[in-house]
Amino acid sequence: LKEIGGPGVQKLRAASISIVGSGALGGPCAMFLAAAGIGQIEIWDDDVIERSNLQRQIQFGERDLGKAKVDILAERLATDHPGTRISTRRKKWSPSDPLSGSILVDATDNFPTRYALNAAAHLSERLLVHGAAAGWTGQASVFASGCRDGAPCYRCWVPETPPNAAACDEVGVVGPVTGMVST
């Protein structure tokens, strides 16, 4: 693309992204970011691959069942995009854990972690890219509250956990919805 050119490619190579969650949202997101030439991707997740994940988590296959999501995703990214440095954290992210990325990606499925990532992004003056999906619906947003005065944050948009909120493991999610949100 003429809008990117050499300087744009250099910016992509210099960029660092932290993704919390490597399932149906975080996995494809990481794949597209690595393919775009992002220089460094940090991925956090404590989960293992289960058969029920496969219909929406396209980065995994039958051969990966029972293995750590971050390990398999990192192997795939390293093979397909060796120019991207991948670091993994096989644990659930908590607010006391430092995030190395200049941009934070919330690919989680629970409100406490979403709110904690929102606070981390705001306090550290970083962009927060948020995605969520359940059932037949999904949403994607970018929040710059820590970067621009007056810009709203995730908690401004969703001040408290909705009373009818359910995680996708409770209500299910259609695979193509996660594909649209994660890209």
Q: Where are the predicted features?
A:
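Adenine nucleotide-associated cytosolic modules
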Residues: 1-183
